[in-house]
Amino acid sequence: MKNVTDSFVSLGHWPSAGSFGFNTDILATNPINLSVVLGVLIFFGKGVDLLDNRKQRILNTIRNSEELRGGAIEQLEKARSRLRKVETEAEQFRVNGYSEIEREKLTLINSTYKTLEQLENYKNETIQFEQQRAINQVRQRVFQQALRGALGTLNSCLNNELHLRTISANIGMLGTIKEITD
Amino acid sequence: MNVLSCSINTLKGLYDISGVEVGQHFYWQIGGFQVHGQVLITSWVVIAILLGSATIAVRNPQTIPTGGQNFFEYVLEFIRDVSKTQIGEEYGPWVPFIGTMFLFIFVSNWSGALLPWKIIQLPHGELAAPTNDINTTVALALLTSVAYFYAGLTKKGLGYFGKYIQPTPILLPINILEDFTKPLSLSFRLFGNILADELVVVVLVSLVPLVVPIPVMLLGLFTSGIQALIFATLAAAYIGESMEGHH
């Protein structure tokens, strides 16, 4: 009876207070239950894969971002090459345009030259023509003047004797001319 | 005679078995104050656990988090989520406060439920979760009060006190009373829950040392986690409430 109660007492024995120390009573300090609880906690904690999910989500996000980045870079590259192409085309167009303008200019200048030359010719011709006309007029005037003078001279100093002499001289001259022509 | 001593022994044994220490403290004398040494010791351990694990977790940060870093980032995300839901858009500066509250209370509670504190024997009292002591929870609750007053005053200046007569001036006494009931309810809820959890476990262990306390201990883990969450959520809610604009 005493043994039983003693064991019972020692079972619930609380080490008396007083100083720091370690309580070695396994039942009072409860490590068995604690380890079971800890084990259950870890077991069920492992079952819940919040952390794995999170990691997976982060990985997916990173992968998606990488893909998006790759796509964006590709698009950028494409856009750049297109820009380059368009730039060269623009350059070509500009060069072409310049040469076209140059050609146009040249042809315009040439045609203007031709027109100018023609005008020059016209001018020269007109001048010559005018000159010719002026000369003719002068000639005509001089001729008329001479004729008038001759007529005056003839009218003033022509008498019968002279008249006759002249006629005979002329007849003689015509006669010689006729002889010569014959 | 023999029988008498035997029966006395038996009674003493029975008394010892059901003798659960409550209100026994390991007093330290610091500058005229009596402080509860066991609470300080366990608080230091909790602080060391938090600081140490956080330091280890962030020592070598990776782009793709693994192990400890992943876990701590998850915890941080959780805390940010709680603060954001309760405080609103301007939750950023309050994440450290809410996070400190939540982590300290959570690790304290769980340390009480998981660590074999009783292996270490003190001259007086026994080691338990720091939140098992009313002083810790009152300190935390008062910090929360200070925090929400600070939040309201910095956000709105003296206009903050306008909320006391907010729906009608008749409610002024109740609104003032609220400032006292908030820390009171916060501290008592946490203290009561944790103390009750631990007491139930201790009593059960002293009655049936094996297997039977395990469900209660698991329940204790659950409730202590919930209590930490409740405390953090309420602190964030009070801060958010004092910062929100009145319409």
Swiss-Prot record, chain B:
UniProt entry keywords in alphabetical sequence: ATP synthesis, CF(0), Chloroplast, Hydrogen ion transport, Ion transport, Membrane, Plastid, Thylakoid, Transmembrane, Transmembrane helix, Transport
InterPro entries the record matches: ATP_syn_F0_a_bact/chloroplast (IPR045082), ATP_synth_F0_asu (IPR000568), ATP_synth_F0_asu_AS (IPR023011), F0_ATP_A_sf (IPR035908)
Source taxon at top rank: Eukaryota
Transmembrane parts of this sequence: 38-58, 95-115, 134-154, 199-219, 220-240
Predominant place of localization: plastid
Cellular compartment(s): Plastid, Chloroplast thylakoid membrane
SUPFAM superfamilies reported for this sequence: F1F0 ATP synthase subunit A
Molecular-function GO terms, alphabetical: proton-transporting ATP synthase activity, rotational mechanism
Pfam families xref list: ATP-synt_A (PF00119)
Membrane topology: Multi-pass membrane protein
GO cellular component term, pick one: plasma membrane
Annotated NCBIfam families: ATP_synt_6_or_A
Function: Key component of the proton channel; it plays a direct role in the translocation of protons across the membrane.
Quaternary data: F-type ATPases have 2 components, CF(1) - the catalytic core - and CF(0) - the membrane proton channel. CF(1) has five subunits: alpha(3), beta(3), gamma(1), delta(1), epsilon(1). CF(0) has four main subunits: a, b, b' and c.
Family named by the database record: Belongs to the ATPase A chain family.
Name of the protein described by the UniProt record: ATP synthase subunit a, chloroplastic
Organism: Nicotiana tabacum
Chain's gene name: atpI
